[in-house]
A protein has these predicted regions:
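Short, well-structured N-terminal submotif of metal-dependent ribonuclease cores
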Residues: 1-35, 50-61, 128-129
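Histidine- and aromatic-rich ligand-binding microenvironments
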Residues: 5-6, 35-36, 92-96, 115-117, ...
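Active-site-proximal, substrate-binding regions of enzyme catalytic domains
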Residues: 42-71
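Active-site neighborhoods of divalent-metal-dependent phosphate/nucleic-acid chemistry enzymes
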Residues: 70-122
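Conserved N-terminal glycine/acidic-rich loop preference
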Residues: 73, 123-134
Length: 134
């Protein structure tokens, strides 16, 4: 099974938060992850902002390892235009709209979205996605 994984779900693997164990259970039970290119930036910045130097190195190494096994959707013109449309329709914020468009590109409504972001989850459900986590 393929899962679209947003930054809020991935971050929980490297930074101890509420639902970190749930995120691991969901993600480690699956063999294929897909996400948008912008997730790389979101996760790296979250690690940098929230962890000390030693923890940051460990988390960054773990994230880089996970990133190698993740299929990445390019944020090309088509995806960006679709994100703008989806943002208008759902009221989603910019990065959330990019996640929705990338998930759509990754396989449409047949690919569940794993997120712990309530607003992204609501927007995804309103578009007919199965949302896991929030």
């Amino acid at each position: 099974m393929t899962l679209y994984v947003d930054s809020s779900a991935l971050i929980k693997r490297y930074v101890a938060e509420d639902d970190s164990e749930d995120a691991d259970a969901i993600l480690l039970g699956d063999t294929e992850w897909v996400t948008g290119r912008h997730t790389f930036v979101e996760v790296h910045l979250a690690i940098h902002r929230r962890l000390g130097e030693t923890e940051r190195r460990v988390a960054t190494t773990a994230f880089e390892r996970d990133w190698q096994r993740t299929f990445v959707v390019a944020l090309d013109d088509v995806v960006c235009r679709r994100a703008a449309e989806l943002g208008i329709v759902t009221g989603a914020r910019s990065l959330d709209a990019l996640h929705l468009a990338a998930a759509e590109r990754a396989g449409g409504r047949s690919v569940p979205i794993v997120t712990f972001d309530v607003r992204l989850g609501q927007a995804g459900r309103s578009l007919g996605f199965v949302v896991i986590g929030s």
